Structures are given as structure tokens and as C-alpha cells.
């Protein structure tokens, strides 16, 4: 049976180098499951694989979208499942790596068939969010779908807005489209989680932010600043520097905020991943143990 090896873990843990070693060991390409590496022109802030790394191993789902393109976990599921059906014709084991929790779950479990939202409805809601804030949109969700209102992370404006988009477009509660039925995949899924001691991970995150700044993150963010309203740029590393460009923060404060928000995101990732009993955890330096585990799983 064909296999999909998923190397996952928090930001900054060291997934990239290990994924290259695993891919080379099993003769596999790498599929990125990082929701921001999909976009062009953001290689530094998204820690995208370098040209040298992409020369070592063929990569997919990296630098394929414009900043203005709308893309969701549902799109990712469709694209990656289709890609795997082609790759598995000649490559029995394929590696996927990244830390975008929803994207990984989309490939492993599938996403319910939610209607596609029209640009007019999406634009209207984001305009309302920009002018009025999230409170009236939350109130609309509570009225239209009290079940999902109780379940959704009400601080996550993207999820709140998406639910209201569906309610407006269909006239039905967003929750009515959710079945929570796991889809069957025609391949074995092997999940390997990477984690480090908390202090070690925090130090790596801080050092990585400093390295990104030395490699030109400030200039990369400045080029993206005219597009700051786009969802593709509502991400750690850019939104903080946008506050510096607007005069709201000093550069030192913006950099400290990037480090802090990256650490917070890493904790959120681990909270999500720790709920999954299918993940076998390793320290990234335990390469031989990881290879042994994978060799036993891939038959």
C-alpha cells in the first residue's frame, strides 16, 4: 500500500532539514503543508525552502499563488489528494511537511463539502469587518447559527467571517453542512511529530527571527505593505512590521512582537497536535530512531 509520511511540529522546530533527509532516504518529493509558503514573494518570512533545498528534492505547493489569490484548506485538500494520486503511481512513499494544522487535517481526514462563497459576499463581510469590527458579525452568527457560535473560536475573525459567509449565501446554518465524517484515503498515513524542550524551542524561534531580519525580511515586508489588507498577509512576521511602517511601533518593538507571536503560535500548534493520538513524537536529532520507525511502518 502506498504511504504518506507527514512530518509535523511547531514553527522553528527543525522540520525542513529532517524532511529533506527523509525524502532523500525514501526517494520522495516533498509536499509543503504550510499555508503561507504557497504564496509567491514571501520566501523569508514564511521560511520557504531555499533554491538549494529545492534543488536537492522536488517540492510541491511552494510559491504557486499570488498574494491576491483566495485559497482555503478545502482547496488544499482537493489539490493535494489529486497530486498524491499522480505521485503514487510511480512513488510509493511521499513526504509532506509543515505546521498548518487545518491543512494537515484536510488531507488526513477530509473537509465537509461547504458551498463556495461568492466574491461579493466575502468582500462585503470583510469591508464590514474593516469598518465596524467583529462584534456585529459575531451577533449575526449567534442569530443565524447559535450552534456554531458556541463552538467557534470567537477571537479568530477568519473563521467567524467564513461561517457568516455561508449563512448569508445559503440561508442555512453553517453547522448544517458539517458532518465530521472522516474520509477514507487510498494510502497509509504515517505521522511523525517533532518537538523540543520549551526553552530550546523558544531560543530557536528567537534566533530564527533575527536571522530572517538579517536576510532581508524588512525589505520583503515593505514590498508587501501595499497589499497588507489581504488575508494572505495576516500572518506573523508581516503584520508586526506593517505596524512599524505605519508608525505605530518602533522597529525593535515590531521584532520583539514577531518573536513573541511566533512563540504563541508554536504553543497553539502543539496544543492542536497533542490531541492527535496517531502522531509518534521524536526530538529532531533522533534521526536514526525516526528512520527506524518509518522503515517499520512502510511495508
Curated annotation (Swiss-Prot):
Record-level GO BP terms: tRNA modification
Q: Which Gene3D superfamilies does the annotation name?
A: 1.10.20.140, P-loop containing nucleotide triphosphate hydrolases
Highest taxon of the lineage: Bacteria
Q: Which family does it belong to?
A: Belongs to the IPP transferase family.
Record-linked NCBIfam families: miaA (TIGR00174)
Q: What class of enzyme is it?
A: transferase
Report the cofactors.
Mg(2+)
Name the gene.
miaA2
Q: Which UniProt keywords apply?
A: ATP-binding, Magnesium, Nucleotide-binding, Transferase, tRNA processing
Q: InterPro entries, per this entry?
A: Dimethylallyltransferase (IPR039657), IPT (IPR018022), P-loop_NTPase (IPR027417)
The positions annotated for binding ATP are: 9-16
Q: Which residues cross the membrane?
A: none
Name of protein: tRNA dimethylallyltransferase 2
UniProt organism field: Parabacteroides distasonis (strain ATCC 8503 / DSM 20701 / CIP 104284 / JCM 5825 / NCTC 11152)
Output the Gene Ontology terms for molecular function: ATP binding; tRNA dimethylallyltransferase activity
Residues annotated as region Interaction with substrate tRNA?
Answer: 34-37
Record: residues binding substrate: 11-16
Q: What is its EC number?
A: 2.5.1.75
Task: Tell whether Ligase is among the UniProt keywords.
Answer: no
Q: Which reaction does it catalyse?
A: adenosine(37) in tRNA + dimethylallyl diphosphate = N(6)-dimethylallyladenosine(37) in tRNA + diphosphate
- Tell whether Iron is among the UniProt keywords: no
> What is this protein's function per UniProt?
Catalyzes the transfer of a dimethylallyl group onto the adenine at position 37 in tRNAs that read codons beginning with uridine, leading to the formation of N6-(dimethylallyl)adenosine (i(6)A).
Q: Which Pfam families match?
A: IPPT
Q: Per the record, where is site Interaction with substrate tRNA? A: 100, 122
Query: What is the protein's quaternary organization?
Result: Monomer.
Amino acid at each position: 500500500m502506498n504511504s504518506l509520511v507527514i512530518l509535523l511540529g511547531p514553527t522553528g522546530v527543525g522540520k525542513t532539514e529532517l524532511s529533506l533527509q527523509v525524502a532523500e532516504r525514501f526517494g520522495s518529493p516533498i509536499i509543503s503543508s504550510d499555508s503561507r509558503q504557497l504564496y509567491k514573494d514571501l520566501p523569508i518570512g514564511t521560511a520557504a525552502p531555499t533554491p538549494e533545498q529545492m534543488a536537492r528534492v522536488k517540492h510541491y505547493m511552494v510559491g504557486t499563488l499570488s498574494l491576491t489569490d483566495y485559497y482555503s484548506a478545502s482547496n488544499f485538500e482537493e489539490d493535494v489528494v489529486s497530486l498524491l494520486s499522480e505521485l503514487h503511481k510511480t512513488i510509493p512513499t511521499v513526504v509532506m511537511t509543515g505546521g498548518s494544522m487545518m491543512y494537515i487535517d484536510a488531507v488526513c481526514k477530509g473537509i465537509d463539502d461547504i458551498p463556495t462563497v461568492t466574491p461579493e459576499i466575502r468582500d462585503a463581510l470583510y469591508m464590514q469587518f474593516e469598518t465596524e469590527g467583529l462584534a456585529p458579525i459575531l451577533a449575526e452568527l449567534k442569530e443565524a447559527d447559535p450552534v456554531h457560535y458556541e463552538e467557534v473560536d470567537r477571537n479568530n475573525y477568519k473563521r467567524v467571517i467564513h461561517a457568516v459567509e455561508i449563512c448569508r449565501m445559503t440561508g442555512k446554518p453553517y453547522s448544517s453542512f458539517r458532518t465530521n465524517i472522516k474520509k477514507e484515503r487510498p494510502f497509509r498515513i504515517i505521522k511523525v511529530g517533532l518537538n523540543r524542550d520549551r526553552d530550546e524551542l523558544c531560543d530557536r524561534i528567537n534566533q530564527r527571527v533575527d536571522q530572517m531580519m538579517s536576510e532581508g525580511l524588512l525589505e520583503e515586508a515593505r514590498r508587501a505593505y501595499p497589499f497588507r489588507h489581504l488575508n494572505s498577509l495576516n500572518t506573523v512576521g508581516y503584520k508586526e512590521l506593517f505596524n512599524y511602517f505605519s508608525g505605530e511601533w518602533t522597529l525593535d518593538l515590531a521584532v520583539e512582537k514577531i518573536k513573541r507571536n511566533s512563540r504563541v503560535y508554536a504553543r497553539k500548534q502543539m496544543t492542536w497536535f497533542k490531541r492527535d493520538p496517531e502522531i509518534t513524537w521524536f526530538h529532531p536529532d533522533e534521526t536514526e530512531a525516526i528512520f527506524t520507525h518509518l522503515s517499520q511502518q512502510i511495508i
